[in-house]
Each structure stands twice: as structure tokens, then as C-alpha cells.
């Protein structure tokens, strides 16, 4: 039988099984909908029952509705590409189909094995050297319910039964050539053994994943999160998983990966949105971001918080019987220092501040009594403290002198250069103080990403104010939905992507979300844009606390870039990295990257021309990458090219992204924007999977 006929026959054979799977899926969905309807009926019936029975029925309703909703969400999320693989075992002759979730028929016979189950591990781990009893491994490519193609690997040729067909070019190489879309796809069908070892590593402690561009670090980390939730749902599912990425562009890019695997109990945050209620995208100039990210800022913020607010009264004057008691500025400063010296956040220390003020006033009254030849007895002192403590004028002063502090307010105070200099002391240089105060004063673009870690630090320093308990009953949660408490920021597992770029202050911010969590940390030192890697490494170690279990995996195969493109990127970072820190590209396309000399005067036309060429050539996305301060200009140049496949991004926002083709605008601009400019350039050069055009006005950007 010819190859095309064999392929068609094998596709038809798999289609028959896929049809059975989707028929069963429809049955399971119908059952879940019936359970959902029954749950809501229980809720209506509970209104007619006694209180005890009512509570029991409402609990039963919530559990039934919750589980029905979860089942429906899972079934709907896994609909596309539900089955993607098959294992044929040599010893038993059994065929195991692998997919996004496990499905059994009405007789409990296995139709699909969940990719995270131990029985599916051989799909990713079996090799010709260690076949794990797998004679044939098949990747099944589907669109909806239709089988489009199959690709086979024979792992035990000597055990291949007569009549067992083998077709295809190899699933991985086929996937590498496929066009990219706006969002990252999951890689459950093409996970390689070195990646699978990381995904299935134990949950405890800290798992570090290092590797160069295109090694699949991000995809592996996300699949690891899905695997851990599947295998340890009771342990990790309660508080959920937090995934922290470098930018909103990146988190949007990866946003569909985990839902496509049925995992919804995952929070995706960029560094600018880790703090609830904030959404920062603005990037500070590198020199400013370096100061804001330094751990030195903790001392600066602590001193700023402990200083008197700018509008606090400078003097306390209060009448007590026939005497006028005064606390002058120096005395008030001593009182403030005394309160802070006893520890505790200021928003929970107002009572202590009031007590210390009253004692200071009593000291003044005692001095007045001695000056007049008398004394203030202990009983009279207690009486003074009680009476003044009940006076409305004292409490008016207290509210102004020791107000409830808000992080944004304190950060705003530091726009005053003199106030910032006082808070900084010797922690910052005069130049750094000027840079920071100017940055804090300019709020035209809102908070910067680096500001968010400072706000979070202040949030912890000032503390939550004490609140009176409300008699109001909290609203009843919506049936079927798991409610996360407001401002609850603890997670069971934390994934940090592009970890090499986190500043020490950002590490402190993320660490607060995972004091009792296990961690998956993804990064590549060669791509780091943080100027002091040792400083950041120390902060990361502090974030992990006393966790003694730390395991490191290094991914060495670059599946994204062609060998031709990566060779150029490696030249750009020569001298910045050791050879063993660079990955190895596994495929050649015969297409060399184009480096086009241009002038600044013709740059706009050249960018439009290059983008148009690539849109005509590739079937997927085209990225246009420039220095951060040039993004808006480049965006205007391309405004007339209405193509949703075209994306303009800045050098720092390009981290973690990939495109079928890339236009890199003036590489020297990326080098000049920070002290780690060559590493940033390396990142930009490794975003393309197929074609790369570099437009360079400065010819000295590439080392000879």
C-alpha cells in the first residue's frame, strides 16, 4: 500500500476512536448539566425548610453546583485537540490514547489517559535507548473533532508487529515549522524528555529551570503547574498557583495555556500587577529602575514612613484646668521616635501614639508643678491622662499628627527632593536622590513597574488599620464559584518567569505571596537586564527562605530559532556569556538573517518595507522590535498597515515572546538604553522562528 493510502487509512482508524471519545464527552457534559440543574433546584427547595435543614440543603447545593460547574468548565476547555497521542505497547499489545484529560466509557474502560497520569509518562520519556515497552508512539493532530494527520516514532523496530503501519515525519519537527499565533500554544503533544523530567519533578522546595532562548522554559513551567495541580490538587489547589511574568504583553501571550489544559485555579500577574488594585506598564529609564529596585530602598521607605507627614501639626497646645500644656516640634519628634522604637506598623499604633503623647503632656504638667514649687501626684497624673485622653481637641490633633498612612501617599512625599534626601541619609547618592525625586514627581504615565514593589513594601510597613467588627452579614457567594478572600495574597505554588530580571525589591514583593509555597523559577542569566546579578541572586535566595530542597534543570536545545538566526544572536552576545551558557539550535532552514544598512532619514520607509515583505512571506505573526523609547514612533510608522499579525513591541516587552518573523529596528539603540544592552539585544535577536531582518544605521552594533 502506498504512503498516502496508508496515511489515510491510519487517519480513518484514529478518527473512529476520536468519534467514540467525543460521543462520550457529550454524554458527560449532559450529565453535568443535569447535576447543575438539580443543584439549583435544591437551593429553591431549601427556602421552605427549617433552619437546620435549610443550611444542610444549601451546603449540598453549593457542593453540587460547584462540582458541576468545574466539570463543565473542564470539558469545555479540553474540547479542542482533546486527544493528541497514542502508545502501542509491545508486551501487552495494548493501545493507550493520551489526551488533555482522562475519559472512561460507561463501562469504565479507558478511552483517553490524562497526559499528567503516570500511565502517560512514556509518551514523553520513552526513547529508542529506553523504549519503556513502547513499540510505536503516535502524535495525532486534530482540529475540533476531525483528525488532520498522524506522525509516528518507532522505538522498538524488532518488536513491530506485522501489519502495524508507520507514517509521518516526526511530530516535533512538524510543530517547529508551524506558524505562530497571537497566543502561546500548549506543547502537550510535543514535550521532549528533558522537558518532561522538569515537569514531573517533585513539588517540594524550589525547582529552577535555566536555559537559553527557545528551549521551552516558559511552556515547561506552565505545564509543570498543570501537572502539579493534577497530581497534588488537595495540597496546592486550595490557595492556588500564582504565575508572575515580566509584562502585560507576556501574560496575555501565555494566558490561554493553562485554561487549555483545564486549569483555572491559576492567577497570572505581570510585575506591574502583582499588588492588588495596581496596573503599571510604564518602564523607568534603566538608571532609575536600578535605584528603585535596589534593596537600599527598604531603608529609605522605612525612614520616609516614620517621618512626620508634611501636613502634620508641628506643635500641640492644649489647656488643662488653669494650665496650658505645650509640646514643641522637637518634643513631638521624640514622641514619634519613641512610638516607632517600640515596633509595629504605624496604622496599628495610633493607640500607642495617643498613650505616648498623653505621657509626654503629663511630663510637661509635672515640670510646671515643680517650677511652681509643687508636685504632680501619681493620682493627679492618672487623672490628667484620663481627662485629656477623652477630650475632642486632643483626638482632633491625634488624627492629624498620626493619620492613617497610605503607600501611595508616602511615595508621593518623596517627590520633595529635600524630604527624600532626609529619608535616604547615606543610602543614596545626591545624583540618585535627584533622579528619584524627579521620577516620583512625574506621574504623567502613572506608576512605573518598579514603583509597584515600593508600594507593596510600604503596604507591609504601614500595616492595616484596626477596624471595628461589622455586624453586617457578608454577601452570600455565588453558587458554584470558589471565592478567594479579598486581599488574600498567599499561594500554594509560585511560578516566576524571566526571573533573571527581577530586582531585589521585586523579589521581596513576590516572596510575600509565597511564604509557605513551593516554587518554580525560570530564567537565563545571559538574558538578564538587571545590572547586578549577584545582588538579585541574593534577594532570590532570601525569597526562598529556609527551603533546603532546591533542584536545578538546564534545558540546552533551542527549538525556536533556526541555526542561522541563532548564530547571529550568539555573535551579538560574544564576551557576555560562556559558550556552555548558550543553547544549541536544532534545525536549519537555509534562510540567513538579513542585516540591512540604512540611514536614520530612511528608517521609517525601511521599517514599512521590511514588515510588508515578511507579512507577504510568512503565514503567522511578524514582530517589530525597537528600543523602549522608540516604540511609539515605530508604531506610528506602521499605523497604516492594518494587519492583526503585525505586533510592535519594545525591547524589554519582547521577553518570552516569539514570532514567525522579526524586524529589529536599530540594534545600537537597544545597546545604548542600559548597561545590559547587549543582553537585551540578544533577547530581541532570538524572537524569530523563521526569518529575521535587522535594520542598522550604526554599523558598530555587531562585534567583529
Identify the residue ranges that each predicted region occupies.
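Phosphate/oxyanion-binding active-site loops and adjacent basic polyanion-contact surfaces
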Residues: 183, 187, 217-221, 297, ...
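Non-catalytic, well-ordered alpha-helical scaffold segments
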Residues: 19, 81-84, 185, 196, ...
Amino acid at each position: 500500500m502506498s504512503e498516502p493510502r496508508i496515511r489515510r487509512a491510519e487517519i480513518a482508524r484514529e478518527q473512529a476512536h476520536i468519534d467514540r471519545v467525543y460521543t462520550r464527552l457529550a454524554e458527560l457534559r449532559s450529565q453535568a448539566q443535569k447535576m447543575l440543574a438539580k443543584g439549583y433546584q435544591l437551593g429553591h427547595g431549601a427556602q421552605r425548610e427549617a433552619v437546620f435543614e435549610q443550611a444542610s440543603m444549601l451546603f449540598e447545593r453549593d457542593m453540587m453546583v460547584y462540582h458541576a460547574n468545574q466539570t463543565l468548565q473542564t470539558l469545555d476547555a479540553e474540547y479542542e485537540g482533546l486527544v493528541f497521542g497514542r502508545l502501542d505497547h509491545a508486551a501487552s499489545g495494548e493501545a493507550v490514547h493520551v489526551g488533555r484529560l482522562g475519559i472512561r466509557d460507561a463501562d469504565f474502560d479507558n478511552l483517553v489517559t490524562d497526559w499528567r497520569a503516570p500511565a502517560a509518562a512514556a509518551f514523553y520519556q520513552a526513547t529508542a535507548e529506553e523504549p519503556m515497552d513502547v513499540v510505536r508512539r503516535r502524535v495525532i493532530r486534530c482540529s475540533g473533532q476531525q483528525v488532520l494527520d498522524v506522525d509516528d516514532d518507532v522505538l522498538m523496530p524488532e518488536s513491530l508487529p506485522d501489519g502495524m503501519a508507520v507514517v509521518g515525519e516526526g511530530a516535533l519537527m512538524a510543530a517547529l515549522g508551524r506558524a505562530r499565533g497571537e497566543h502561546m500554544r500548549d506543547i502537550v503533544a510535543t514535550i521532549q524528555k528533558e522537558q518532561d523530567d522538569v515537569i514531573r519533578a517533585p513539588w517540594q522546595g524550589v525547582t529552577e529551570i535555566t536555559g537559553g532562548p527557545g528551549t521551552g522554559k516558559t511552556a515547561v513551567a506552565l505545564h509543570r503547574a498543570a501537572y502539579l495541580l493534577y497530581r497534588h490538587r488537595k495540597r496546592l489547589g486550595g490557595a492556588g498557583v500564582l504565575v508572575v511574568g515580566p509584562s502585560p504583553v507576556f501574560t496575555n501571550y501565555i494566558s490561554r495555556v493553562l485554561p487549555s489544559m483545564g486549569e483555572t485555579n491559576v492567577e497570572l500577574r505581570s510585575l506591574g500587577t502583582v499588588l492588588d488594585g495596581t496596573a503599571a506598564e510604564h518602564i523607568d529609564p534603566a538608571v532609575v529602575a536600578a535605584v528603585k529596585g535596589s534593596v537600599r530602598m527598604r531603608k529609605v521607605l522605612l525612614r520616609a514612613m516614620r517621618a512626620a507627614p508634611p501636613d502634620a501639626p508641628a506643635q500641640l497646645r492644649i489647656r488643662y484646668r488653669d494650665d496650658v500644656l505645650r509640646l514643641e516640634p522637637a518634643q513631638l519628634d521624640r514622641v514619634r521616635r519613641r512610638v516607632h522604637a517600640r515596633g509595629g506598623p504605624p496604622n496599628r499604633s495610633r493607640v500607642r501614639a495617643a498613650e505616648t503623647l498623653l505621657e509626654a503632656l503629663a511630663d510637661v504638667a509635672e515640670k510646671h508643678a515643680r517650677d511652681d514649687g509643687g508636685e504632680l501626684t501619681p493620682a493627679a497624673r492618672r487623672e490628667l491622662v484620663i481627662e485629656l485622653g477623652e477630650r475632642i481637641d486632643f483626638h482632633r490633633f491625634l488624627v492629624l499628627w498620626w493619620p492613617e498612612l497610605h503607600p501611595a501617599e508616602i511615595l508621593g512625599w518623596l517627590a520633595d527632593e529635600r524630604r527624600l534626601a532626609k529619608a535616604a541619609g547615606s543610602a543614596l547618592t545626591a545624583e540618585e536622590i535627584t533622579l528619584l525625586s524627579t521620577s516620583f514627581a512625574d506621574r504623567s504615565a502613572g506608576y512605573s513597574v518598579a514603583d509597584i514593589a515600593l508600594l507593596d513594601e510600604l503596604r507591609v510597613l504601614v500595616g492595616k488599620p484596626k477596624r471595628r467588627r461589622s455586624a453586617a452579614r457578608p454577601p452570600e457567594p455565588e453558587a458554584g464559584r470558589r471565592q478567594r478572600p479579598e486581599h488574600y495574597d498567599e499561594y500554594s505554588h509560585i511560578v516566576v518567569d524571566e526571573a533573571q530580571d527581577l530586582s531585589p525589591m521585586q523579589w521581596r514583593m513576590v516572596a510575600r505571596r509565597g511564604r509557605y509555597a513551593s516554587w518554580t523559577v525560570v530564567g537565563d542569566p545571559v538574558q538578564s537586564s538587571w545590572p547586578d546579578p549577584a545582588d538579585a541572586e541574593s534577594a532570590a535566595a532570601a525569597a526562598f527562605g529556609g527551603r533546603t530542597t532546591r533542584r536545578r534543570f538546564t534545558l540546552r536545545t533551542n527549538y525556536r530559532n533556526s541555526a542561522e538566526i541563532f548564530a547571529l544572536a550568539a555573535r551579538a552576545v560574544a564576551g557576555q556569556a560562556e559558550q556552555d551558557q548558550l543553547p544549541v539550535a536544532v534545525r536549519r532552514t537555509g534562510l540567513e538573517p538579513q542585516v540591512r544598512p540604512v540611514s536614520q532619514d530612511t528608517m521609517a520607509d525601511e521599517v514599512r518595507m521590511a514588515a510588508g515583505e515578511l507579512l507577504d512571506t510568512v503565514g503567522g505573526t511578524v514582530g517589530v522590535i525597537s528600543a523602549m523609547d522608540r516604540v511609539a514612533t515605530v508604531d506610528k510608522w506602521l499605523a497604516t498597515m492594518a494587519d492583526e499579525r503585525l505586533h510592535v513591541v519594545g525591547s524589554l516587552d519582547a521577553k518570552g515572546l516569539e514570532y514567525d518573523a522579526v524586524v529589529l529596528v536599530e540594534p545600537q539603540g537597544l545597546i545604548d538604553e542600559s548597561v545590559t544592552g547587549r543582553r537585551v539585544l540578544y533577547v530581541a535577536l532570538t524572537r524569530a522562528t523563521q526569518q529575521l531582518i535587522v535594520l542598522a544605521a550604526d554599523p558598530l552594533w555587531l562585534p567583529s
